[in-house]
């Protein structure tokens, strides 16, 4: 049976919006636009993603904290460039009860301005560095564009942010490399191939020295940013007076970095791995990795259900998340429900399987079925789950790579966007004026230049298609979410 991805590719927006509700991820009907209710199944998946993030944070020496959601306007105003980047997006708290507040408060859009006044109290000596903390919290941004669950929302409810402070620019750079390694581990855990780009000056995070963004390719040829890393140098340290005493007794400002992700990670998983039947979850994050569907006949119900429960218990003991569907409905309806929810592997057992000590494994990613011996069930299930994960990654990698096109002219770039969208790589002189002109002509956003920067150098002899000067870089453009 062939996997169908017609609606997934041709009418992605409708497919995605329907699936978010029918698969039990979120309910969009909450009476505040852009703020959605997490449903139990969706939250379980997100918690499995976060479990991996927590483990990576622990492995790399980050400590978890939890800051208040309200930030005084006086703290928010300390970093001018940061305010300029966020002032149109913040929610203001102006009253306590009926009384106007002396100092207005904002609901955090991100936590730099909340955290760094405390950093200036906590960091005193070179012995306190490197200082590495993180939190997963709700943040609030007044999005004026069209909202979409998990992708563009006004309450980002699973916002991960790691903040670090260092005694030198070089150590901060080492932290960025560690962030990239953590992100790569997470992306493999989610079977998500991605690209990293260094953002252009006009699109870096407000207050950053430079910003990196991780993008994935969505089914409609648009890109989705699912992670960011920023090196702040000493920009925020000077605004918030975060200094430390050196070994020689001098005082220096710290160097800072941040690393951020959100529930867009789950949006990417749903979008990239799905098909016309619904979600296809990587086994690593599926709340149920294996569903067992008993298919009894009237005279064999007790034996078939007992056999299904026996297999489930053995899989559970082996650490596999398993569920036996004993609902009194037709097997076909059960298949439909679990395929919609993206359960990676289905085991079907009937009277013949009980008699022959066998079971049928049905893969969600390929819809293929194989019959296996009951005695080898744990080994076969593990092997199949690993194969599903690897297949999801390779399929998504091929999709991403097939949607990256290198061109030399604006006309060629336009043709790519008209044909299939995706990512266009084009020579660029490095001047902001030319970059903005290309954004305008292509009706696309410059993602930046490939990172690490040795990948970003333009081949010799290439010209910027706007000004005709020698190209310094290869720049990436895409239509984005």
Swiss-Prot record:
Keyword Ligase assigned: yes
Keywords annotated in UniProt: Aminoacyl-tRNA synthetase, ATP-binding, Cytoplasm, Ligase, Nucleotide-binding, Protein biosynthesis
Cell compartment(s), UniProt: Cytoplasm
Coiled-coil annotated residue ranges, if any: none
GO BP term, pick one: prolyl-tRNA aminoacylation
Gene Ontology CC entries for this record: cytoplasm
Domain notes per entry: Consists of three domains: the N-terminal catalytic domain, the anticodon-binding domain and the C-terminal extension.
Function: Catalyzes the attachment of proline to tRNA(Pro) in a two-step reaction: proline is first activated by ATP to form Pro-AMP and then transferred to the acceptor end of tRNA(Pro).
Protein name according to UniProt: Proline--tRNA ligase
Native organism taxonomy: Archaea, Methanobacteriati, Methanobacteriota, Thermococci, Thermococcales
């Amino acid at each position: 049976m062939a996997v169908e991805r017609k609606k997934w590719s041709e009418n992605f927006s409708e497919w995605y919006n329907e699936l978010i509700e029918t698969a039990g991820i979120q309910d969009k009907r909450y009476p505040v636009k852009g703020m959605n209710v997490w449903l139990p199944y969706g939250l379980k998946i997100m918690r499995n993603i976060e479990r991996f993030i927590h483990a990576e944070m622990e492995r790399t020496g980050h400590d978890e904290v939890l800051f208040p959601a309200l930030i005084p306007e006086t703290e928010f105003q300390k970093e001018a460039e940061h305010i300029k980047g966020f002032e149109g997006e913040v929610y203001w708290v102006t009253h306590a009860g009926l009384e106007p507040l002396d100092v207005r408060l904002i609901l955090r859009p991100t936590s730099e301005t909340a955290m760094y006044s405390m950093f200036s109290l906590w960091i005193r000596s070179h012995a306190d560095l490197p200082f590495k903390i993180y939190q997963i919290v709700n943040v609030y941004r007044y999005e004026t564009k069209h909202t979409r669950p998990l992708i563009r929302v006004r309450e980002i409810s699973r916002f991960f942010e790691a903040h670090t402070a260092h005694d030198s620019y070089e150590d901060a750079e080492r932290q960025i490399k560690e962030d990239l390694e953590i992100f790569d581990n997470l992306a493999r855990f989610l079977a998500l191939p991605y690209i990293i780009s260094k953002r252009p000056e006009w699109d870096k995070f407000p207050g950053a020295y430079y910003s990196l963004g991780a993008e994935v390719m969505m089914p409609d040829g648009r890109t989705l940013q699912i992670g960011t890393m920023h090196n702040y140098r000493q920009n925020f340290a000077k605004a918030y007076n975060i200094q430390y005493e050196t070994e020689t007794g001098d005082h220096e400002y710290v160097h800072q970095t941040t690393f951020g992700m959100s529930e867009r990670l789950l949006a990417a998983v749903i979008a990239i791995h799905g098909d016309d039947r619904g979600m296809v979850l990587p086994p690593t994050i599926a709340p149920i990795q294996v569903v067992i569907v008993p298919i009894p006949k009237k005279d064999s119900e007790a034996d078939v259900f007992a056999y299904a429960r026996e297999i489930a218990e053995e899989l559970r003991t082996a650490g596999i998340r398993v569920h036996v569907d004993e609902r009194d409905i037709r097997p076909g309806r059960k298949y439909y429900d679990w395929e919609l929810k993206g359960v990676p592997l289905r085991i079907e057992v009937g009277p013949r399987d009980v008699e022959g000590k066998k079971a049928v494994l049905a893969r969600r990613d390929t819809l293929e079925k194989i019959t296996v011996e009951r005695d080898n069930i744990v080994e076969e299930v593990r092997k199949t789950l690993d194969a599903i994960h690897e297949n999801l990654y390779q399929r998504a990698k091929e999709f991403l790579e097939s949607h990256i096109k290198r061109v030399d002219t604006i006309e060629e770039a336009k043709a790519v966007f008209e044909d299939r969208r995706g990512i266009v790589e084009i020579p660029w002189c490095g001047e902001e004026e030319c970059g903005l002109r290309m954004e305008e002509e292509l009706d696309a956003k410059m993602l930046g230049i490939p990172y690490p920067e040795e990948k970003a150098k333009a081949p010799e002899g290439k010209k910027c298609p706007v000004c005709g000067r020698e190209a310094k870089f290869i720049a990436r453009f895409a239509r984005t979410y």
